[in-house]
Structures are given as C-alpha cells and as structure tokens.
Swiss-Prot record:
It catalyses: L-threonine = 2-oxobutanoate + NH4(+); L-serine = pyruvate + NH4(+). The keyword Amino-acid biosynthesis applies. Residues 327-402 form the ACT domain. Disruption phenotype: Cells lacking this gene show undetectable threonine ammonia-lyase and serine ammonia-lyase activities. They are capable of growth in the absence of isoleucine, whereas mutants lacking both tdcB and the citramalate synthase cimA are auxotrophs for isoleucine. This is L-threonine ammonia-lyase. Its EC number is 4.3.1.19, 4.3.1.17. One of its GO terms (molecular function) is threonine deaminase activity. The gene is tdcB. Pathway: Amino-acid biosynthesis; L-isoleucine biosynthesis; 2-oxobutanoate from L-threonine: step 1/1.
C-alpha cells in the first residue's frame, strides 16, 4: 500500500511548484443530475494535465547526484510533457522515448519543454522497451508513468486539495489508466474521510482495471482506438492494482460517443476544454453509470491536451450523440429550383443547413438526376425524426448517413 505520509511530503514539495487547480461548482450539471457537482480542473494545470505532480515529486525526492545522468521515460502523451517540464525546472537533462506514430504536436510540445525526444517503435510497448534499455546503458533514472510510490504520492495531492476545499465531499470520480492517479487520490481520501465513495472510470476501449477486479488479479486486455487515449492502458500496475482493489468502491465503463458528448457538454456549459480521458467522469454521470449518488460529487478533469485537429471530429461526434447533427443524402431532379425547394422544405421542418454539397457527376446517378449531401443542425432525436418524416412526406428519398 501507499503510505499516507508520502502524500503529505509530496504536498510540501509541490506546493510552490505546481498549480493548485480550481475546484469549480457547476450550477448547470448540478441541476441536470440532481446533486451538487464540482470539477477539479487539472486541465488547467501546468503542462495541461495532472502528470506533472507525480513526475516532479519523483524527481525532487531524489538526491542530486542521482539526477546527474538525467531522467528517461517513455510516453506518447501527458507524462512525457510532465517529465520534460519537471526536468527543465530542476535543470536536469531528460530523454523521452515516443512511438513513431506519435502526433507531431505532442512531439513538439515535449521538445519545447526541453526534452530530447527519441521516436522509436510502432507502439508504446516498443518505445517503452527502448527506453528501459537506454536507461540501463546510461545509468539515468527511469520515471515510471504510474507504477511508482513517489509518482502516486504526487498525484495523491489532488485528493488533499479536494478535502481542504470541500471537506464534506461525498463522492469523487477519477479516470483510470494505469491507476496511479486513483491510487494516490484514494489513499489521500481514505486516511481521513473513509466514508467518501470513490469511483473509477475507464473507457470501454481499455477496461483493464474493470476486468482485473472481476478476475481478482491483474489481467491484460486488448486496447482499441479511443478518444480517451490518455487512459488506454493494457493492464494496471503491480503497485496500483492492490490499492484500487482495496480502496476504490467501484469501477465503471463509458463508451466513445458518451465521452464525445461529455467533452462537448463541458465546452458548452463550463467553457472548459478537456481531453477524452479527462471527460470520462462526467460521461459516467451523464449516462447513469453510477447509481444511488447523493451529496457533493467531484469529477477529476485530469487533462486538457486534446489535439486541435481532433476537436472538430469530437464536437461532431458529440453533437451526433446529442441528436444535434444530421447528415443526409437526397436525390433530386436536375432542374432549376430543385435545390431551392429542398432548402425550403428543410426550413419548414425547422432545421438549419450548415453544409451542403451538390454532385451531378456521380456515375451511379441516372441521367437527369443530381445528388445532394446535407449537414443539418437539429434540436434532438425527436426533431431528427420530424425532419426525416417531413422530407419523406413531401416526396424525397432520404438516406441518413452515419
């Protein structure tokens, strides 16, 4: 288990080095869910995620001579930036091994914090193996992303901050990847507030802790592509799993469309930009994955490092999940005014056209016909059915596109 004193010591070390992130009460989500909802905004942390807490606590706990040969880690995301920033802050050289498929913006961000970036391997596991080999050859310190007591203790300072600001908290929902974040937070909270309900949330695309708890031992699961790439971990840590098993009340799963909808909801209602991994606690609440909740409830928004190019895709998926986006294919007679008449009928159905594409050159079209692809803004699933029924009722052949 993780000693509570390690978290207290981490809090002392980090107090002036990391941001004490805001704990925000949300009136909108409190009314929607029927309980007081608060967000712990680690998306506003330095480097944009909680990972700096664990990385910096690990490094500042080492004797200076142990850091002389630098630090090494493997990561394709937030941990890379946390290690790079922490090393730069302490004047320590850092090397980060990243898979060759890592998006360029993450590579640039890590380099901007002063790290040497080595792109190697087809996936994280191959990059990790290369990092371990380099660490053994150089004698540098390896900073594990989650399965180290000092790293867990650093993440646990989030729990102390929540208790200091909201001592009567009743529930806390925490994302789970490798388990370092929830292990630290659970240890911090259970020490003085054993009655608090602690709930872990995973993506169904990487349910490693969920299935490990079901089996009663650590199991490795296949991981599929997910919006919550920051928690897409094949198995929990050797050190984190026993803490999750003993201190966490339950672990629930959320689906991809639910994550997308939560990202959009946070952006619209709180003006907070959160990455997929950070949105899973709210996704769990919005989709009633947790039952019988009462009292003040905290969602840990673990990070906000979402790829700019991904935002538009996520927003579109979130709008689809909320019934606020509809894409149609409609075949028209290739005659003057046909497109205008279609637009008029769409207006009659109270939908708003956002994008329209007119194609009369497709080989699949009969002579004298044209095809229109239309993207519409709608007001929910009931409105979508009204739009489709109206268009069909006036004679259009409508194909709903996914």
């Amino acid at each position: 288990m993780l000693p509570y004193t390690l978290i207290q010591e981490a809090d002392d070390r980090l107090r002036k080095r990391v941001r004490r992130t805001e704990l925000i009460h949300s009136h909108h989500f409190s009314e929607k869910l029927g309980i007081p909802i608060y967000f712990k905004c680690e998306n506003l942390q330095r480097t944009g995620a909680f990972k700096i807490r664990g990385a910096l606590n690990f490094m500042t706990s080492q004797p200076r001579e142990a850091l002389a040969k630098g630090v090494i880690t493997a990561s394709a995301g937030n941990h890379a930036q946390g290690v790079a920033f922490s090393a730069d802050l302490l004047g320590v050289p850092s090397t980060v091994f990243m898979p060759e498929s890592t998006p360029p913006q993450k590579v640039f961000a890590t380099r901007d914090y002063g790290a040497e970036v080595v792109l190697t391997g087809r996936n994280f596991d191959e990059a990790y193996a290369a990092a371990v080999q380099a660490q053994e050859e150089r004698g540098a310190l390896f900073v594990h992303p989650f399965d180290d007591p000092l790293v867990m203790a650093g993440q646990g300072t989030i729990g102390l901050e929540v208790l200091q600001e909201l001592p009567d908290v009743a529930n806390i929902l925490v994302p789970i990847g490798g388990g370092g974040l929830i292990a630290g937070i659970a240890t911090a909270i259970r020490e003085t507030h054993p009655h608090v309900r602690i709930i872990g949330v995973e993506t169904a695309a990487a349910p490693s802790a969920h299935y490990s708890l079901q089996k009663g031992k650590i199991v490795q699961v296949p991981v599929t592509v997910t919006l919550a790439d920051g928690i897409a971990v094949k198995k929990p840590g050797v050190n984190t799993f026993p803490i999750i098993r003993d201190l966490v009340d339950e672990v629930v799963l959320v689906e991809e469309e639910e994550i997308a909808l939560a990202i959009v909801a946070l952006l619209e209602r709180t003006k907070l930009l959160v990455e997929g991994a950070g949105a899973v606690p709210l996704a769990a609440l919005l989709n009633r994955r947790v039952t019988d909740l009462s009292g003040k409830t905290v969602c840990v928004l673990s990070g906000g490092n979402i790829d700019v190019k991904t935002i538009s895709v996520v927003v579109e998926r979130g709008l689809v999940a909320a019934g606020r986006y509809l894409k149609l294919k409609v075949e028209l007679d290739d005659l003057p005014g046909a497109l205008a008449r279609l637009a008029t009928e769409i207006a009659e159905a109270k939908a708003n056209i956002s994008i329209i594409t007119h194609d009369r050159r497709s080989k699949s079209l009969p002579i004298g016909k044209t095809e229109v692809l239309i993207e519409l803004e709608t007001r929910g699933f009931e409105h979508i059915q009204e739009v489709i029924s109206h268009l069909q009722g006036v004679g259009y052949l409508v194909d709903v596109l996914k």
